[in-house]
Amino acid sequence: GDPFLRF
């Protein structure tokens, strides 16, 4: 979902 969390 988030590019920083990779989900």
Swiss-Prot record:
Organism: Planorbella trivolvis
GO BP: any one term: neuropeptide signaling pathway
One cellular component term from this protein's GO annotations in UniProt: extracellular region
Keyword Calcium on entry: no
Source species taxonomy: Eukaryota, Metazoa, Spiralia, Lophotrochozoa, Mollusca
Source superkingdom: Eukaryota
Role: Appears to be involved in osmoregulation by affecting the kidney, mantle and skin.
Protein name (database record): FMRFamide-like neuropeptide GDPFLRF-amide
Residues with the Phenylalanine amide modification: 7
Family in the record: Belongs to the FARP (FMRFamide related peptide) family.
